[in-house]
């Protein structure tokens, strides 16, 4: 649901999600030059891609220092800083080409030196985003994001033409509830198995990706408790929530249950999630429905 809503609205978060996923995939495939380009493009969409860059650099350096003797650390370390330091910065600056070539860009004329204007622009953006504390009726603490405690209403009207005296039309930036509620449990399970693998010193690539995605996409927001933030930011780590669900489904399929039973349970779960998505589709797409039908979809009072 959340991805669908983003795909129909003019926000940068979906483009950010695409390039971040591409970067993480390429990084996982050891295609580091391409990953550096992809994460640079992601940073060109929104600065929050930096958290994924930091996570990938941290893991890459950990692997280098744990696998190479001290005499062989210099070359691979320098290479990683070029791939995930110099290259993303160059790509990010290149993404500003239109601004540099135009005389009408925001703050472009702040200084006769275009680079000074660019730095000033960044200073203003940083000040705005770190100092944004104005109250908003749909702001939501990151603690509530996983369970869709306070989804963001992008649009609401009470039009006519639904066959009833009272009609409603809303675009609610909310994930499919049952998917996210189950995903919350799945993420907790995945983290538990990841910690067990860490203690046993075994490598679990799937779990590593899930934890990296959740740590980089979700965890940083908890450090902005006074800032005005919204649930729809969660789209960046939704793919990793789904990966956690897939991981748990695989655990079930590989369990001691008879294959027919485990497959039936997984199929039933997927079916329920699909039906839940269809049920909420009208408020994902802004369909005109009766007020009573809209109210039936407000399972929590905090969704109103």
Model-derived features: positions:
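Short acidic/glycine- and proline-prone juxtamembrane loop motifs at membrane-interface regions
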Residues: 2-13
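Specific aromatic-rich, kink-prone transmembrane helix
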Residues: 15-39, 241-244
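Membrane-interface alpha helices of multi-pass inner-membrane proteins
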Residues: 26, 33-53, 57, 218
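Hydrophobic transmembrane alpha-helices of multi-pass, membrane-embedded glycosylation machinery
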Residues: 41, 53-64, 236-239
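Transmembrane helical bundles and short interhelical boundary loops of multi-pass, membrane-embedded
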Residues: 58-65, 74-84, 88-92, 97-111, ...
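Membrane-interface helix-loop-helix junctions at transmembrane boundaries of multi-pass membrane enzymes
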Residues: 67-82, 189-212, 260-261
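Membrane-interface anchor segments at the N-terminal boundary of transmembrane helices
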Residues: 149-207
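Transmembrane-helix signature of polytopic, lipid-linked glycan biosynthesis machinery
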Residues: 214-229
